[in-house]
Swiss-Prot record:
Modified residues (2,3-didehydroalanine (Ser)): S199
An annotated Gene Ontology molecular function: phenylalanine ammonia-lyase activity
Residue numbers annotated as active site: Y104 (proton donor/acceptor)
CDD domains named in the record: PAL-HAL
GO BP terms in the entry: cinnamic acid biosynthetic process; L-phenylalanine catabolic process
Binding site for (E)-cinnamate: N256, N379, K451, E479, N482
Stated name of the protein: Phenylalanine ammonia-lyase class 3
Top-rank lineage group of the source organism: Eukaryota
Amino acid sequence: MATITPQKGSQSEVGVSNTDPLNWGNAVESLKGSHLEEVKGMVAEYREAVIHVGGGETLTVSKVAAVANQYLQAKVDLSESAREGVDSSCKWIVDNIDKGIPIYGVTTGFGANSNRQTQEGLALQKEMVRFLNCAIFGYQTELSHTLPKSATRAAMLVRVNTLLQGYSGIRFEILEAITKLLNHNVTPILPLRGTITASGDLIPLSYIAALLIGRRNSKAVGPSGESLNAKEAFHLAGVDGGFFELKPKEGLALVNGTAVGSGVASMVLFEANILALLAEVLSAVFAEVMQGKPEFTDHLIHKLKYHPGQIEAAAIMEHILDGSSYVKNAKLQQPDPLQKPRKDRYALVTSPQWLGPQIEIIRFSTKSIEREINSVNDNPLIDVTRNKAVSGGNFQGTPIGVSMDNARLAVASIGKLIFAQFTELANDLYNNGLPSNLSVGRNPSLDYGFKASEVAMAAYCSELQYLANPVTSHVQSTEQHNQDVNSLGLISALKTVEAIEILKLMSSTYLVALCQAIDLRHLEEIFKNTVKNTVSRVALKTLTTEDKEETNPFRFSEEELLKVVDREYVFSYIDDPLNVRYPLMPKLKQVLYEQAHTSVINDKNVSLLVFEKIGAFEDELKSLLPKEVESARVAYENGNPATPNRIKECRSYPLYKFVREELGIRLLTGEKALSPDEEFEKVYTAMCQAKIIDPILECLEDWNGVPIPI
């Protein structure tokens, strides 16, 4: 089997090896280890201040995201060791033109017009850039058709990485110029639409070429968002020597590649990996606040299903629940089996089975895109060692289109699970005692909590499910039927950007709702203790008898009364605990009447006057309980709760702490003027700025990477 040898000065660690000629082994090897460890590695790379390109360095989606991100904008460092290989392919082009050897796109036309011949190589490259500059930007309209700045930066980095490998026939100085633009935050304006990512992303990449040669229609954006022409862009970036006159093949090298699609895909997948991990943690928190049975994470269940994504998702949830104060408390106080279903609903109990395949898809898509961004994907390729130009179809961006379609479906599935969990959480028929809409105000008639938020979540989820439809099934034959199959890679990547944004909207809303539920569980515990203590005191005061000759029918009533309090959901009555339409007071009185009635019938020493004690009990409770409940609520609101919040003893606490302390998000209540959007916006912004990463990882920092032994 022949060895594919990198040309001198080009990248050496990305290619196919003799021992793995089909590269399947390398593909499998890249998926070893846990998804969590891979995400940790991605985060570490994302936070590197300088991204080294060339000289054997492998580009990753996280490195691309770091350079693209407007909040980080890591610097790019070109490896000087790549210069020789890059320049040698450029020299090969010039030498072979002089020999009269025909070379596609250098001495011939393009695509379906490749039968045309020319010896005017410089003019041909110039004309190619001109005719490819055919996009519409809509500068004078409300709707912009401009590629986001971050996506353009990603494309520039990926294109430089490809061209540095020395198979493209372009000068090193041009790559240095693109790098200077990146490092000085000067970004060419590229069109949002117009590419099918089949002969590469020809049209958008042509606008980078247009800026480099100083075309009058080219524009750029400066560090502060200011509009720049080509001359101003070069000056600001410190590119000396004036505009470039493209040599034969250099224009084609710049435009004939998949960098825009794969650059956007890299950004998308970095976020998708983070959001997938977040969904696992949020599902565990959901189990905590829903008082779910933790056995759904038992390793035996998932070991027998074999799927690695499912096994890891379950192990992560198991780890969080194993350290949960909620779970430990539930084991101490087994709930009445009549109060809740024997088995939790699917959104909880099958969350590992649901999330597992999505994680696998996202991981595989990530590796596919990382192969693409490290590939040489223009045409023709210059093989200096064999002294020939080789024409092929590496510009076909099918790995991008397919990976993005698959990843978008996974993102939509994660969103569907989040929506199912959210609707269960907000519905008092299913949420095991939490108030309807997660309302926390004193008067539920004037506090509708997350009611509208659920409607918004339905809208988000519907749009997300629509976006899950494939792009790659909509291919159109074009360019005189030369490009009769095409990947639609960038289109699919941009649709996945939309999907990621919607998932962030959903995750932001859901995270705030979960924190609300955590605090409601805290209030629930405080109120329940308050009610039990008050009932005990009132019973002791009003139901005892001083006559030793008289049998007290209520001598065992306190225990039964407290059982009533334990059985009833606190939020079903706490806004008006003595209201006869609410369950608490009628059931307390029922216990006393039954005991009194039985005693009067069976024991002649019991007087009918015992029924008066029930009235005294009711009157005393009406006098005392509302005051005690309000006092407990005020103490909670003032930061002095009678009972500490259990979340502080949970492994999920870092996420709660991030929301409540770092972002300063408080309980949402109709008693305050604060609207939900003000708080949701804070979480969404934090997600966009990647600030959510550390709290997620802190929830899992002491996980050893393996399930709890069976």
